[in-house]
Amino acid sequence: MLQALLIFVLQIIYVPVLTIRTILLVKNQTRSAAGVGLLEGAIYIISLGIVFQDLSNWMNIVAYIIGFSAGLLLGGYIENKLAIGYITYHVSLLDRCNELVDELRNAGFGVTLFEGEGINSVRYRLDIVAKRSREQELLEIVNRIAPKAFMSSYEIRSFKGGYLTKAMKKRTLMKKKDHAS
C-alpha cells in the first residue's frame, strides 16, 4: 500500500514536470528543458522501477495510471498559471477605434493597426502582441471598449525586432541599473 501511494505521488510530480519540459522545448528554451529533464528522468526511473518489481501488484499499476491522469490535470493547471511565452491577437473592427488602440498601447501592449477591405466596407485589424500572463488583461480591455470585435489568437514561438523587443531591452537595462545601485 505504501508503494502504491509513493507511485501515485511520484506520478503527480512527474507528469507536470514532463508538461513543463515539453512547453520549454516548444518555446525553444532548450537549456531550461534539459535541466527539467534531469528531474523528469529520475522520477520516471524510480516510479517505473517500483511498478516493474512486481507486475502482479495491481495496486501499484492502478496508482501509476491514476497518478498519471491526476498529474495531467495538475500539469495543465500549472501551465496556465505559469503562462510561459507570448501570444498574438488579431482583432477585427468595423471602425478605426483609436480609443482601443490608445488604451492598449498605454497599457504596454504592442499594437499594429491595419486597414483592409471587407465584403461590404472598410475593416480594421489590430495585431496585438502580449505576454501570455497578461492575456486576460488584454481581453478585458478589448471587451470593454469593442465588445463586438472579432478576435482570433495564436501563440508565438519566437520573434525579433519591433516595439516589444525594444521595451524588453529597456526594462532589462533599468533592472540592471536598479541592482547596481
Swiss-Prot record:
An example Gene Ontology CC term for this record: plasma membrane
Main location, first listed in the record: membrane
This protein's UniProt keywords: Cell membrane, Membrane, Transmembrane, Transmembrane helix
TM region positions: 6-26, 32-52, 58-78
CDD domains on file: YitT_C_like_1
Pfam families tied to this protein: DUF2179, DUF5698
Cited InterPro entries: DUF2179 (IPR019264), DUF5698 (IPR044035), UPF0316 (IPR022930)
Membrane topology: Multi-pass membrane protein
Compartments it resides in: Cell membrane
Keyword Membrane belongs to the record: yes
Similarity remark: Belongs to the UPF0316 family.
HAMAP family: UPF0316
Protein name stated in the entry: UPF0316 protein Bcer98_2136
Organism: Bacillus cytotoxicus (strain DSM 22905 / CIP 110041 / 391-98 / NVH 391-98)
